[in-house]
């Protein structure tokens, strides 16, 4: 099956073609992403109405571009997958509307995909994918969750953030230190030059049982340290390093605890913060020390993209699942409520 995937949940427009007749990374025939960062920069964050309108402008040209890169005509598609939630309702409706219309015109099945299931499965697009069962850390600007994956489509929430997501905390700390939007990646780049231990911040909630997270108190601690400093460039990089170390340590401690809880040695990390170099190195070292393995998607597939949607959709379409003809989206959607897969035969 040749499946086209459409992602439009927030401020990236993503389109990809996944071919189940191929294996490994070769199965991803093409993928394209258009980012709206420049559009939202002057507002310091995503403006939902502007995001929706930009998806309308960019989605069809991106579809044509991706099909051309895959060397396919639209008539050769066997199915359509699209992000149905969670996300911004207007942005989701743009992608869902285009996907449903395309599927109807081609007389092929369509499937609405859970955005976070797409992220969770994205490491399976690589040449040496992890095998189930595994523990997944989903870490992005909107989510920080630990999920036990007993089988593809069978998910148990182990813990989640009680307030700010890790990526959200990165962006907010960057903003309070005067970095332009989106500040998270710039903060991480500054942290690489900082001196370890110059600023030591709390590792929140690691001293109590459980697998939930909280980053709002850490954010306040960083704010106070920054306000009480001379706010020089040298201090900025050291504060950035102290903050990043605190977040990475917290995530690593909770991940190790989750692996122990479910008696598993494989950790999958996905979501935008999964591209962070410090986090990758820390989790890889932790898993190696345990005799286990940490698996990540390539950095280009950590942020929102159509490839993960095409792949997740292919799994469910091959299992015989599909969505009805109505254009429906679910801005808030519990991944544990997803139907299990009847078949696990989709080739990777």
Swiss-Prot record:
Entry's cofactor comment: Binds 1 Fe(2+) ion per subunit.
Cofactor names: Fe(2+)
Gene3D superfamilies documented for this protein: 3.30.420.40
Top EC group: transferase
SUPFAM superfamilies: Actin-like ATPase domain
MF terms (GO), sorted A to Z: iron ion binding; N(6)-L-threonylcarbamoyladenine synthase activity
Residues holding substrate: 138-142, 171, 184, 276
Catalytic activity: L-threonylcarbamoyladenylate + adenosine(37) in tRNA = N(6)-L-threonylcarbamoyladenosine(37) in tRNA + AMP + H(+)
Transmembrane segments: none
Keyword Repeat: no
EC code(s) of this entry: 2.3.1.234
One Pfam family in the UniProt entry: TsaD
Cell compartments where the protein resides: Cytoplasm
A biological-process GO annotation: tRNA threonylcarbamoyladenosine modification
Annotated InterPro entries: ATPase_NBD, Gcp-like_dom, KAE1/TsaD, TsaD
UniProt KW keywords: Acyltransferase, Cytoplasm, Iron, Metal-binding, Transferase, tRNA processing
Gene Ontology CC terms, in alphabetical order: cytoplasm
Protein residues bound to Fe cation: 115, 119, 304
Source species, domain of life: Bacteria
Principal localisation: cytoplasm
PANTHER family (alphabetical): TRNA N6-ADENOSINE THREONYLCARBAMOYLTRANSFERASE, TRNA N6-ADENOSINE THREONYLCARBAMOYLTRANSFERASE, MITOCHONDRIAL
HAMAP family in the record: TsaD (MF_01445)
Family: Belongs to the KAE1 / TsaD family.
Job description of the protein: Required for the formation of a threonylcarbamoyl group on adenosine at position 37 (t(6)A37) in tRNAs that read codons beginning with adenine. Is involved in the transfer of the threonylcarbamoyl moiety of threonylcarbamoyl-AMP (TC-AMP) to the N6 group of A37, together with TsaE and TsaB. TsaD likely plays a direct catalytic role in this reaction.
The name this protein goes by in its record: tRNA N6-adenosine threonylcarbamoyltransferase
Organism: Xylella fastidiosa (strain Temecula1 / ATCC 700964)
């Amino acid at each position: 099956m040749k499946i086209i995937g459409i992602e439009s949940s927030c401020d990236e427009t993503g389109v990809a073609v996944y071919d189940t007749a191929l294996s490994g990374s070769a199965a991803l025939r093409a993928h394209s992403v258009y980012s709206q960062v420049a559009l939202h920069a002057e507002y310091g964050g995503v403006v939902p109405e502007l995001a929706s309108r930009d998806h309308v402008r960019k989605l069809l040209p991106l579809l044509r571009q991706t099909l051309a890169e895959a060397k396919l005509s639209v008539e050769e598609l066997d199915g359509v997958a699209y992000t149905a939630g969670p996300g911004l309702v207007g942005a989701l409706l743009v992608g869902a509307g285009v996907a449903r219309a395309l599927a109807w015109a081609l007389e092929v099945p369509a499937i609405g995909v859970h955005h976070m299931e797409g992220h969770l499965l994205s490491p399976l697009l690589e040449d040496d994918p992890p095998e189930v069962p595994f523990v997944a850390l989903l870490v992005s600007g909107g989510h920080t969750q630990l999920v036990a994956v007993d089988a593809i489509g069978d998910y148990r929430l182990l813990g989640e953030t009680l307030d700010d997501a890790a990526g959200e905390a990165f962006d907010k700390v960057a903003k309070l230190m005067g970095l332009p939007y989106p500040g998270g990646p710039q903060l991480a780049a500054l942290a690489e030059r900082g001196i370890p231990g110059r600023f030591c911040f709390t590792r929140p909630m690691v001293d109590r049982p459980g697998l939930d997270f909280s980053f709002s108190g850490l954010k306040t601690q960083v704010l106070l340290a920054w306000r009480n400093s001379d706010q020089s460039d040298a201090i900025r990089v050291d504060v950035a390093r102290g903050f990043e170390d605190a977040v990475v340590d917290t995530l690593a401690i909770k991940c190790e605890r989750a692996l122990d809880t479910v008696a598993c040695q494989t950790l999958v990390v996905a979501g935008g913060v999964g591209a962070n170099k410090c986090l990758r190195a820390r989790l890889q070292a932790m898993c190696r020390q345990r005799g286990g393995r940490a698996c990540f998607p390539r950095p280009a597939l950590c942020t929102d993209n159509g490839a993960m949607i095409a792949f997740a959709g292919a799994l469910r379409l091959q299992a015989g699942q599909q969505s009805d003809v109505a254009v429906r989206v679910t801005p808030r959607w519990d991944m544990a409520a997803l139907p299990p897969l009847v078949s696990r035969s989709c080739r990777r």
